[in-house]
């Protein structure tokens, strides 16, 4: 069982002015056989606050996967990708590229997604759009590889690759 942390980036949500349907969607889609939610928070669209929370959670022993929602667009306050990049040890660009490629089949707006994916220590961090629809579509793409990616992060060798 892997520890899951869900971080919703929304100033209005952090002030209680907006329901967090996208964060709830992440929990609903991932919690179960492979994942247990160990952290959940709604924070404002502030780069330092986001970076600090990502680093804190990634460095915790019980967090294997952090999934964020919100702040990946082109808006003036959308700084989640920059905050994430500031704390990553390595990017995993293929996951973000796959999410964009697949969601482009549903909407041309996928071209302006700035989602990033990477690792800090042994923790995988995935940034998702703020919409519930975007969360579902993107997670559908990467869910099949997340457990294997986490296994790779937690041991030196993996003898079998999933097909």
Language-model features: where?
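Non-catalytic beta/alpha edge segments that cap or flank active sites
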Residues: 1-163
């Amino acid at each position: 069982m892997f520890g899951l942390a869900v971080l919703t980036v929304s100033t209005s949500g952090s002030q209680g002015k907006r329901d967090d349907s996208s964060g709830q969607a992440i929990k609903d889609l991932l919690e179960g056989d492979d994942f247990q939610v160990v952290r959940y928070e709604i924070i404002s669209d502030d780069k330092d606050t986001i970076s600090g929370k990502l680093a804190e959670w990634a460095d915790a022993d019980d967090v294997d996967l952090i999934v964020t929602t919100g702040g990946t667009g082109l808006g003036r306050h959308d700084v989640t990708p920059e905050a994430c990049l500031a704390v990553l040890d390595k990017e995993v660009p293929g996951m973000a590229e796959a999410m964009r490629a697949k969601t482009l089949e549903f909407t041309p707006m996928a071209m302006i997604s700035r989602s990033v994916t990477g690792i800090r220590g042994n923790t995988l961090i995935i940034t998702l759009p703020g919409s519930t629809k975007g969360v579902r579509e993107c997670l559908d793409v990467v869910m099949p590889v997340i457990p294997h990616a986490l296994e790779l992060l937690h041991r030196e060798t993996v003898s079998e690759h999933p097909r």
